[in-house]
């Protein structure tokens, strides 16, 4: 009888142990996973051995980029905060876009794209072909680009007009060097840095097309002798010649 009871007790113990096995295995798996996560987030795990910064720029200093990168390299391949570095680099006024890429097992590749302004906007800002306005240090603003100006929130309209007028003038080798929109909605532009064109507030497309049509016939090679052209008349235009 005692032997029978001992067998039953042993059998119960084995069943209890078997029931615990899945729990123990799950616990071991969790501990292993936790240890792996801790290891991956350890800054000493797979630290970067090579950092490559690529930038084609006249206004972004490599030394400034390196300072920001060094400040944000606080982790290894897995723990490194790429988003924080990208945000920091994007805060530089001349930076248009930033790409941060990790290359296994210990390389970091950073590509920085510079803003490409096509004109100056109002006083101390620049505008890109996509209509993005940014404010770089005044001393870095190029002096040989067109000047666009207009009221707040008019930059898209002014930029579209600038591109439209510039395209129409290509056959005549004339360039729009300034374009202005007043608060009252009046348009004027300057060609080749010296000849002013007044378009007024109404029928802008019609008036400019009239100017383009008459340009080779009346102005053409004499553009340097023209002070201004006034297209604000319902029938015709007025030309002021230089003395």
UniProtKB/Swiss-Prot annotation:
Part of a complex composed of FtsB, FtsL and FtsQ. The chain crosses the membrane at residues 20-40. It comes from the Bacteria. GO terms for biological process: division septum assembly; FtsZ-dependent cytokinesis. Residues 46-115 form the POTRA domain. GO terms for cellular component: cell division site; FtsQBL complex; plasma membrane. The keyword Transmembrane applies. Essential cell division protein. May link together the upstream cell division proteins, which are predominantly cytoplasmic, with the downstream cell division proteins, which are predominantly periplasmic. May control correct divisome assembly. InterPro entries: Cell_div_FtsQ/DivIB_C, FtsQ, FtsQ_C_sf, POTRA, POTRA_FtsQ_type. It holds the Pfam family POTRA_1. HAMAP family: FtsQ_subfam (MF_00911). It comes from Coxiella burnetii (strain RSA 493 / Nine Mile phase I). This is Cell division protein FtsQ.
């Amino acid at each position: 009888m005692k032997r029978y009871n001992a067998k039953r007790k042993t059998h119960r113990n084995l069943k209890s142990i078997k029931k615990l096995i899945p729990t123990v295995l799950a616990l071991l798996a969790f501990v292993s996973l936790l240890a792996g996560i801790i290891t991956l987030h350890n800054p000493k795990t797979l630290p970067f051995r090579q950092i490559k910064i690529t930038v084609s720029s006249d206004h972004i200093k490599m030394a400034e980029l390196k300072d920001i990168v060094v400040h944000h390299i606080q982790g290894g391949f897995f723990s490194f905060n790429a988003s924080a570095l990208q945000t920091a680099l994007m805060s530089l006024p001349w930076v248009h876009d930033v790409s941060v890429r990790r290359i296994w097992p210990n390389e970091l590749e950073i590509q920085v794209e510079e803003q490409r302004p096509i004109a100056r906007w109002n006083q101390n800002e620049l505008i890109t072909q996509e209509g993005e306005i940014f404010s770089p240090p005044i001393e870095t603003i190029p002096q040989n680009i067109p000047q666009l100006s207009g009221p707040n929130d008019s930059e898209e309209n002014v930029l579209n007009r600038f591109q439209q007028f510039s395209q129409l003038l290509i056959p005549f080798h004339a360039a729009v060097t300034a374009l202005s929109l007043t608060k009252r909605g009046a348009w004027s532009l300057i060609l080749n840095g010296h000849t002013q064109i007044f378009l007024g507030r109404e029928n802008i497309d019609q008036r400019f097309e009239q100017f383009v049509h008459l340009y080779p016939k009346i102005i053409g090679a004499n553009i340097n002798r023209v002070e201004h052209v006034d297209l604000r008349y319902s029938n015709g235009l007025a030309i002021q010649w230089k003395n």
